[in-house]
Amino acid sequence: MNTQARLTSTQWKARFKGYVQVTKPGIIFGNLISVAGGFLLAAKGDVDLVLMLASLVGLSLVVASGCAINNCIDRDIDAKMQRTCKRVTVTGEIPLSHVLLFGIALGVLGFGILALFTNALALLFAAIGYVVYVGIYSLYMKRNSVYGTLVGSFSGAVPPVVGYCSVTGQMDMGAVILLLMFSLWQMPHSYAIAIFRFNDYAAAKIPVLPVAEGMAKAKHHIVLYIAVFALVSTMLPLAGYTGTAFMAVTCATSLWWLTMALKGYRQDVDMPRWARQVFGFSIITITALSVTMALDFQAVSQTPLFTLVR
């Protein structure tokens, strides 16, 4: 009896771990930081804790839903990749229908929280990001187009905008800058992953840039996107949304990241190692900027491009 109970307990723990894994906790955590950064930038020190908690929890559940459903969609290509071949949607440890229902439930709960506590614009951006990620990127673009990363970058840039618009209820220049900034950041971040996971993507026949058009072109794009990202990031302080601390941090991190990327042109470069370094510093960069803009906000007069409130 005790042996059976222990076995059941072990199976339950494994099942629980599987459900957690399909939500991709690392992605959720990264998005939490950017949502908080966008929210606190817009709040400018006047923080509504209930609204902030609702924005963080609601958006996290939406992201978790998208990731769970993405696992269902990607099960065939995940089976061909060393990094993902042991996911529960591939092994069958959890039935696919259960993961799908779990993802739908998370989405309903997440969107429900955003609808109840935030505003129509924040909810709209969350919905658009979700549709782009699940419906356009996962179902079609990732498998069929070299531009899949570009399309996916939009959904990856939505979380800080949701946080920002939860406070303002309007689409102003600050929100536009955040959307551009985080979209641009996604590109070198994703291309770096595609380089050090090249064999996986090639085996699954996913047409990411390094696989479809070669390493040389991917390196050019990484450098170009980092350079443009650096310029766009300075728009937050130049437009008066943040102060000198943010300007200093964005200049320092962007310059270091760009210098690191340029090392990819060396003849003796170890490509996988270099790509991992570019990827790793991309996380440091965006985390540093999210934290800094949350602390170094400025009280500026916001001119809305359009307003959509409850």
From Swiss-Prot:
From its record, what is one biological process in GO terms? heme O biosynthetic process
Its pathway is: Porphyrin-containing compound metabolism; heme O biosynthesis; heme O from protoheme: step 1/1
What reactions does this protein catalyze?
heme b + (2E,6E)-farnesyl diphosphate + H2O = Fe(II)-heme o + diphosphate
What's a single GO CC term here? plasma membrane
Q: What are this entry's molecular-function GO terms?
A: protoheme IX farnesyltransferase activity
Q: Name one Pfam family in it.
A: UbiA
Q: How does it sit in the membrane?
A: Multi-pass membrane protein
Q: What is its EC number?
A: 2.5.1.141
Q: Please give the NCBIfam families that the UniProt record associates with this protein.
A: cyoE_ctaB, PRK04375.1-1
Function text: Converts heme B (protoheme IX) to heme O by substitution of the vinyl group on carbon 2 of heme B porphyrin ring with a hydroxyethyl farnesyl side group.
Its recorded name reads: Protoheme IX farnesyltransferase 2
Q: What gene makes this protein?
A: cyoE2
